[in-house]
């Protein structure tokens, strides 16, 4: 306080030494007033004492009862509260300290009798006499999925959650792991979120089953997992997502997660990439973990790689592996996946190969004997009986209940005269012939390079222009094949049959509809040509490949999926965005070149026909007629037949190709309409003209022999392709089929607009995830 504001200064009073200061602001009470207040208090005390002497309830202090009425009111107000329960004895805590929990009846976290409740465990029914004898702390309760999740799960997802819970809790046998092998788009992520949330929150013993879990995924999907947990749980749980950051921060966060054993862990779920887990496995493998989930689990197909071995060192018995394609190349890879989740279920690798793999593969060939086929069938059934205990698989036929119809087409495109001359000269080259003669069971790196060269040539001569200039192997005498007006940096679609067809179809789509298109290739060089074509025709586009950062990918996908955005093309590297990416903003997809691994193509082609799609979808697979691309397609058919036999339990999977057929990669017939159709030996076609339709119970998941076969543009389900066939004159043959009938009924407004404009109406949809890293090598090539 300032001295000028002090009372002594304001009042002008000077204090003498040893004189007490009297505040001038307090009013002095006179003696008469004080005496009156004391008399009133004495009267009140006397009244209270008088009532107490009669055994009645004491009146409130300072309450003056001037009449019987006022006295009655005073007695009511002074009465203590009494709990309206018969024979109730109040408990005021006694000698218990704060924080001591009262003994309560054990019960489930959620009501098992509620509507739409998903009960994962039902305890035994006890009689009242048994309950009296039992320890109250040992009574088991129901395990019920949180209604927040159970109310949004579809029937097949409820079944999947129940299956995984039974497996990880050891209720299906002497194992605690499982493989969720549902095909793309069936909601594997949501099912895992439900499982993790349930195990972290409850058990039949009224406590959490696990205290923490680790989810390992490709680096580009770490952020997507975090978004899924936030989306479905509405922020009720936080995850520790390891993406970016310094080495010191990463080590500190992982050590804290690994060492913490509290049931109240702030971030009980660790989201980490395969690469990061491998680097810091020494930290994460020190302490026990409740459960581990491996997304895109087919990355663990090789039991010898460091990532597989690092994950096997994790101290946990509960292992869940997610993969829509457990069998990609051979049964050895399948064994690695099963052995990861449940070690020793199938024995050692040598035992598995001797007891299962060799007999089954022998029976797959068309030239196998009846005895070999019978033994293969026995071993197949035995293997199925074992793995069915820990694997669940549903096909995307389930999606037909929720998604519009999908048309899938395999289009055989003729090579142009320039491509044809390049192709034949390459095969006639002495250097190429010598390298092929040296190939054994395992193809040499030289042969693999030759295969890659032919694949690029089938797409466009621009992709092999540098090899031609360098007079590389196979192009020693090919300098004069290109036209005189050829410009390497100016795309000419007329030099490639597939680019001519693509050019005509894109122009027709752009002129006659508001559909968006996804262009997918295994090579970033092909994406460069897509860009040149888009700029040439002034199409708006976005591009996603391995050079794009993960943060930018999500923005690009959101921009394309926005129905208000006019972006026409989405160019995608199959290795960068083939897994987990949602592109439901488009309903037409071109798979420009095939991959050795059918799983990669299946993953890439599933980007548009996904949950949230409202328009009919058209999938186009382009292959060069009679070329090495058709041979790759045939190899895919062989692998898919193996997968359908083991995974889908399809005993009648047809066997159309021998191994000798698959070795004939470098043969070429320029006059054939479709080498694949010829080798199918189709009984429904006469001179390449279909005379009998496929069976009614087939769809686009059936074998190519059970698809529609067209050698002309009649009967095609897509007018865009029919017009381009006539205009480009480069299509030789088409296989096509559709999914089951559309289950979602369009509104009357949508139907009317479709009738008026022949264009499916736009629907608002916006959903995104992130993709995998880019890799243009043919890593799944296994030799011939």
From Swiss-Prot:
Its main location: nucleus. InterPro entries: Helicase_ATP-bd (IPR014001), Helicase_C-like (IPR001650), P-loop_NTPase (IPR027417), Rad54_N (IPR013967), SNF2-like_sf (IPR038718), SNF2/RAD54-like_C (IPR049730), SNF2_N (IPR000330), SNF2_RAD54_helicase_repair (IPR050496). The keyword Nucleus applies. Residues 742-784 are annotated as: Disordered. A motif (DEGH box) lies at residues 295-298. Residues 745-754 have a biased composition (Basic and acidic residues). One of its GO terms (cellular component) is nucleus. The modification Phosphothreonine is found at residue 22. Pfam families: Helicase_C, Rad54_N, SNF2-rel_dom. It is an enzyme of class 3 (hydrolase). Residues 2-9 are annotated as: Required for chromatin remodeling, strand pairing activities and coupling of ATPase activity. It comes from the Eukaryota. Residues 501-658 form the Helicase C-terminal domain. Keywords: ATP-binding, Cell cycle, Cell division, DNA damage, DNA repair, DNA-binding, Helicase, Hydrolase, Meiosis, Mitosis, Nucleotide-binding, Nucleus, Phosphoprotein. GO terms for biological process: cell division; chromatin remodeling; DNA synthesis involved in double-strand break repair via homologous recombination; double-strand break repair via homologous recombination; double-strand break repair via synthesis-dependent strand annealing; meiotic DNA repair synthesis; oocyte fate determination; oogenesis. Its EC number is 3.6.4.-. One of its GO terms (molecular function) is ATP binding. CDD domains: DEXHc_RAD54A (cd18067), SF2_C_SNF (cd18793). It is found in: Nucleus. Coiled coil: none annotated. Belongs to the SNF2/RAD54 helicase family. Interacts (via N-terminus) with spn-A/Rad51. Involved in mitotic DNA repair and meiotic recombination. Functions in the recombinational DNA repair pathway. Essential for interhomolog gene conversion (GC), but may have a less important role in intersister GC than spn-A/Rad51. In the presence of DNA, spn-A/Rad51 enhances the ATPase activity of okr/Rad54. This is DNA repair and recombination protein RAD54-like. The lineage of its organism: Eukaryota, Metazoa, Ecdysozoa, Arthropoda, Hexapoda.
